[in-house]
Curated annotation (Swiss-Prot):
InterPro entries: EF-Ts_dimer_sf, Transl_elong_EFTs/EF1B, Transl_elong_EFTs/EF1B_dimer, Transl_elong_Ts_CS, UBA-like_sf. It holds the Pfam family EF_TS. Belongs to the EF-Ts family. This is Elongation factor Ts. It is found in: Cytoplasm. Keywords: Cytoplasm, Elongation factor, Protein biosynthesis. The gene is tsf. HAMAP family: EF_Ts (MF_00050). The lineage of its organism: Bacteria, Bacillati, Mycoplasmatota, Mollicutes, Entomoplasmatales. GO terms for cellular component: cytoplasm.
Length: 296
């Protein structure tokens, strides 16, 4: 039986599976809709499709290295229960190995890479069917070190935060790790004040000005005094979000800029991943979260 666009659409409407999966299912079953549905179920694709609109904001971050290449990546699940289990950690290892042994530019690229004869995307679909939660490879970034560069890397013990720092010049491995650990803990948004955008400054100053004017303690103070207060608060805020301006957590007597200068290096790039950052997560109480696991 010919596999028509109408048949593919009907199968997609009934199962929620992707168009290509539906087409493949129909081709392998001679265009028989019911057999195609069974085919999709056996492959775990129907089950995965039903979870596609759920929020996956938990998971793990990982670091993999090969030669001059370093990759930081994040794989998400719906709950931290799943992120702690062996199957999920095995999947993390597979994703990391696939990333480091290939040269994908985008998530879409790496999902197409063959792993033991099937695309990584299919491997993830099988994991979804087995584990029972939505799982996604959210993002990754590849660093190719130049000969005059060095790295500072840190992966927190719970695998929820990771940082990669790239330096021009050679830095001691321990100090590089300590600086990466600092970034993981203190969350600087920019390397230096020079990197802070004009848009950020233009959005922050009016907020600080309004806060100062609305503070009862500032009632009656002239505008020039309020302006100086706002500038002081803005400078303090910029120091808090600028890596080089921050106080070094390992040695509070030093600023990060002092450590960088003492080691004769410059910070070229700063990459910090934290699981789920920027994802709007559905709030569940603990009992509801447990029941959600039971009812999967």
């Amino acid at each position: 039986m010919e596999v028509t666009a109408q048949l593919v659409k009907e199968l997609r409407d009934r199962t929620g599976a992707g168009m290509l999966d539906c087409k493949k299912a129909l081709e392998d079953t001679g265009g028989n809709i019911e057999e195609a549905i069974t085919w999709l179920r056996e492959k775990g694709i129907t089950k995965a499709a039903k979870k596609s609109d759920r929020v996956a904001a938990e998971g793990l971050v990982g670091l993999v290295t090969k030669g001059d290449k370093q990759i930081i990546f994040e794989v998400n699940s719906e709950t931290d229960f799943v992120a702690k289990n062996k199957q999920f950690k095995d999947l993390m290892a597979t994703v990391g190995e696939t990333l480091i042994n290939n040269d994908p530019k985008t998530v879409e690229d790496v999902l197409k890479v063959s792993v033991n004869g099937e695309p990584l995307e299919t491997v993830i679909v099988h994991a979804i069917a087995t584990i029972g939660e939505k799982i996604t490879l959210r993002r990754f970034k590849t660093v190719h070190l130049k000969t005059d560069q060095s790295l500072g890397v840190y992966l927190h013990s719970n695998n929820r935060i990771a940082t990669v720092l790239i330096f021009s010049g050679k830095i001691d491995e321990t100090i590089g790790k300590q600086l990466a650990m600092h970034v993981s803990a203190m969350r600087p948004q920019f390397i230096s004040r020079d990197d802070i955008s004009v848009d950020f400054l233009n959005s922050e100053k009016p907020i600080l000005t309004a806060e100062a004017k609305n503070d009862p303690k500032n009632a009656g103070k002239p505008d020039n005094i309020l302006e100086k207060m706002v500038e002081g608060r803005l400078n303090k805020q910029l120091a808090e979000i600028s890596f080089l301006d921050q106080v070094f957590v390992v040695n509070p007597d030093q600023k990060i800029s002092d450590v960088i200068k003492a080691n004769n290096v410059n910070v070229v790039d700063m990459i910090r991943y934290e699981v789920g950052e920027g994802i709007e997560k559905e709030e569940l109480d603990f009992a509801s979260e447990v029941m959600a696991q039971v009812l999967k």
